[in-house]
Amino acid sequence: MNTVRVTFLLVFVLAVSLGQADKDENRMEMQEKTEQGKSYLDFAENLLLQKLEELEAKLLEEDSEESRNSRQKRCIGEGVPCDENDPRCCSGLVCLKPTLHGIWYKSYYCHKK
């Protein structure tokens, strides 16, 4: 019985001491892998940053080429009174004289074409 205990204790001590060595080796391997992973991540990050900068430059060029006068000015929506001489109805609408309703306010309203 005593020899079994001594043998078990000896095996246990060896397992613990060798396990610690394996743990240190594993820690070193993990540090090396994380350093390699960081370098890969830095490389990928730099590539992504370059692509984003190129896209941003293209978008800024397109914005600078677009004129401010090319945008549609404020417009009047459907069913809103408009001026016959200066109709500012939104696209798809025309300034027409109403047939039945609206005769008591202004004589022209924006309606669908």
Curated annotation (Swiss-Prot):
Keywords: Disulfide bond, Ion channel impairing toxin, Knottin, Secreted, Signal, Toxin. Residues 61-83 are annotated as: Disordered. It comes from Cyriopagopus hainanus (Chinese bird spider). This is U11-theraphotoxin-Hhn1r. Expressed by the venom gland. The lineage of its organism: Eukaryota, Metazoa, Ecdysozoa, Arthropoda, Chelicerata. It is found in: Secreted. Belongs to the neurotoxin 14 (magi-1) family. 01 (HNTX-16) subfamily. Disulfide bonds join C75-C90, C82-C95, C89-C110. Its main location: secreted. The presence of a 'disulfide through disulfide knot' structurally defines this protein as a knottin. One of its GO terms (cellular component) is extracellular region. Probable ion channel inhibitor. The keyword Cytoplasm does not apply. Residues 22-74 form a propeptide. It holds the Pfam family Toxin_22. Residues 1-21 form the signal peptide. InterPro entries: Toxin_22.
